[in-house]
């Protein structure tokens, strides 16, 4: 590792208004003395809230990495290049995803470069009772991947129960 501190990369859809983004920043601001958090967005946030979000990251001393893509599909397709570069730079012990776009983006990265994730723990927070509204078939594949990696943690019992009914485990 490049430092004595452990690095954790959190992936969010975009630096913008959202419950998952709020949870991610709160985790990163938790001030674990031996953990450095890095935040990366899949799709470029461009609202006034995005500017406030990045200012909050800066104030808290959290490193963040912007997406050059405002289109979701382009952001997902090219995300592996960005994540692989970040992994090589910071050598994270864990990668933590928040919601479906980050989940799919990490899965895509692992398909393209499986060995890069070999020693990295995958953590995934379930934030919603309904997942994969528009991409059910893709969701089933990504869910098997997340279950295989024992990555799932939930923000509530209701979310856990709904998830188990929909995807098993």
Q: What does each of the following model-derived ranges do?
A:
Residues 116-122, 149-150:
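A short helix->loop->beta-strand "cap" motif at the edges of active sites that frequently abuts
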Residues 97-105, 126:
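Short His-centered aromatic/hydrophobic patch
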Residues 10-73:
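N-terminal strand-loop element at the rim of the active site
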Residues 87, 91-93:
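Proline-aspartate-enriched helix->loop->beta-strand connector
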Residues 149-169:
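A short, active-site helix/loop in glycosyltransferases that binds the activated sugar's phosphate group
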Residues 81-85, 135-152:
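Membrane-proximal helix-turn-helix segments that form the acceptor-binding/catalytic region
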Residues 5-9:
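Extreme N-terminal starter segment of soluble prokaryotic enzymes
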